[in-house]
């Protein structure tokens, strides 16, 4: 599914503060990284990013607390590998927030167009959504230092 559009809803570079421990999230960076649909309004994006930050921060709350107890006041102070001058932990956090934001927006996109072609598009989005949720879980597990094996019992 193509999520690019020549239209733009004038997404401003709003900065979402993720608390004192986690890095801030920039709306324009999200939009550039995740190839958002031009129909995305600033209000929808704000809601989706805010919700994703809340959920990811809750998932990582015990890990965050253990890092603070070790003396690390913020994620970027934790010893980690660096990629392009940024901590891999910060990059993984961003991936988790961006993927959850996009998964939530994509899930809601499916119910917008109820025509036959819209129904076929919606069916095709299932795989994309599953991959985004997988990316969220893998990023969270990597931040926690866990492997990203997911086992399903039959």
Predicted feature residues:
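Sparse, context-dependent recognition of short Cys/His-centered cofactor- or disulfide-binding micro-motifs
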Residues: 7-10, 15, 82, 86, ...
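Conserved short "hinge" loops at termini or chain/domain junctions
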Residues: 1-77, 148-154
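Charged, low-complexity surface segments at secondary-structure and domain boundaries
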Residues: 31-36, 78-86, 121-125
């Amino acid at each position: 599914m193509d999520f690019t559009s020549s239209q733009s809803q004038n997404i401003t570079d709003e900065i979402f503060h993720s608390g004192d421990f986690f890095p801030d999230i920039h709306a324009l960076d999200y939009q550039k990284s995740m190839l958002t649909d031009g129909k995305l309004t600033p209000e929808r994006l704000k809601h989706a990013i805010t919700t994703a930050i809340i959920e990811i921060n809750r998932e990582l709350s015990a890990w965050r607390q253990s890092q603070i107890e070790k003396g690390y006041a913020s994620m970027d102070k934790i010893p980690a590998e660096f990629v392009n001058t940024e901590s891999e932990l910060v990059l993984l956090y961003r991936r988790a927030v961006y993927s959850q934001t996009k998964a939530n927006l994509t899930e809601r996109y499916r119910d917008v167009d109820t025509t036959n072609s819209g129904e076929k598009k919606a069916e095709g989005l299932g795989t994309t959504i599953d991959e985004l949720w997988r990316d969220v879980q893998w990023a969270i597990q990597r931040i926690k230092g866990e492997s990203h094996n997911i086992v399903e019992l039959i």
